[in-house]
Curated annotation (Swiss-Prot):
Disulfide bonds: none
The protein's name in its UniProt record: Ribosomal RNA large subunit methyltransferase H
NCBIfam families: PRK00103.1-4 (NF000986), tRNA_RlmH_YbeA (TIGR00246)
Molecular function terms from GO: rRNA (pseudouridine-N3-)-methyltransferase activity
Keyword tags: Cytoplasm, Methyltransferase, rRNA processing, S-adenosyl-L-methionine, Transferase
Catalysed reactions, semicolon-separated: pseudouridine(1915) in 23S rRNA + S-adenosyl-L-methionine = N(3)-methylpseudouridine(1915) in 23S rRNA + S-adenosyl-L-homocysteine + H(+)
SUPFAM superfamilies registered for this protein in UniProt: alpha/beta knot
Signal peptide: none
Sites where the protein binds S-adenosyl-L-methionine: 73, 104, 123-128
Cellular component terms (Gene Ontology): cytoplasm
Record's keyword annotation contains DNA-binding: no
Job description of the protein: Specifically methylates the pseudouridine at position 1915 (m3Psi1915) in 23S rRNA.
Subunit-level organization: Homodimer.
């Protein structure tokens, strides 16, 4: 099972890239994690925000792997504990499909992206910088994989 994290936004600052790379390396023992960065749509004075969201959505949909199980990170999504995420990962692994996790832009996902997702996941009600969400998702995927492998990383 391969996992692709598709994130809309600017290139990550060094500290995010380093943290993500660390969890990407750790996770590689159990599954490869690929980061695909989607350029954000143009915003600003005189620009149509909805057009930017729709443009981002088209690029996100084009980046989806064929037949992948798609999980959109979304505030109204289903909240999961680390243990529940591990259970979901075990279920997804049993399906034999690749995974794609989607992080939206500043205004969230385009409607077509949400509709294309098999499920949505909320990492909580806090408003977080999208760059930090990349790191949180990578860490939680590593934690879930470690739980499934009976690795001592998770000590709850």
């Amino acid at each position: 099972m391969k996992c692709r994290l598709i994130a809309t936004g600017e290139r990550a600052p060094a500290w995010v890239a380093q943290g993500f790379a660390e969890y990407q390396k750790r996770l590689s023992h159990w599954m490869p994690l690929e980061l695909v960065e989607i350029e954000p749509g143009l915003r600003g004075k005189g620009r149509d925000a909805q057009r930017a969201i729709d443009d981002e959505g088209r690029r996100v949909l084009a980046a989806l792997p064929k037949n992948a199980h798609v999980v959109a990170l979304d505030v109204p999504g289903r909240p999961l504990s680390s243990e529940q995420l591990a259970q979901r990962m075990e279920h997804w692994r049993g399906q034999g499909r690749d995974l794609a996790f989607l992080i939206g832009g500043p205004e969230g996902h385009a409607a077509d992206v949400v509709k294309s997702a098999n499920e949505s996941w909320s990492i909580g009600p806090l408003t977080l910088p999208h760059m930090l969400v990349r790191l949180i998702v990578a860490e939680q995927l590593y934690r879930a994989a470690a739980m499934l492998a009976n690795h001592p990383y998770h000590r709850a």
